[in-house]
Amino acid sequence: MTVKFSYITSGERLSRVYESLREEPYIFLDTEVSNDRIRLVQLGGKEDIFILDLFDLGEEGVLFLRELLSSKGIVGHNLKFDLKYLYSYGIEPYAVFDTMIASQLLGDTDKHSLQKVAMHYLGQVLDKGLQASNWGQPFLGKEQLEYAALDVKVVR
């Protein structure tokens, strides 16, 4: 499955992210982490998906996320993982909807990973082979970035 996304590594491009997502009532979110630090934050609206590289954006990216998410709800899968890291950066979303918890409450399946939920409810096969790849390396490959964007696309 191909995923269209914008990879954001410089502060100048954050204004485009803001313009695209500012009117959205909620934002689809996922993260990729390396050594207890957020490397990527994937953000999606109705149309666009953005991958913010916090290793490149640094404090500017963190401040941007604090401001954007403080007034937005987020939707994601297994958000307790993402929230642990977001909170450690002082990023506190306005509201949270976790599709893993929703799946558990519905009780239609006994497995609740994104891979299992996507297959059960959407009939989509997700390859999670890159989940444990090296997110801390200096340059991420196209396959890693596509993998990162895919979770947001599926949850959306």
Placement of each model-derived feature along the sequence:
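Conserved RNase H-like, two-metal-ion catalytic cores of nucleic-acid enzymes
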Residues: M1-K116
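A polyampholytic, Gly/Pro-enriched intrinsically disordered region
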Residues: L114-D127
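Acidic, Mg2+-coordinating catalytic module of metal-dependent nucleases/exonucleases
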Residues: L126-R156
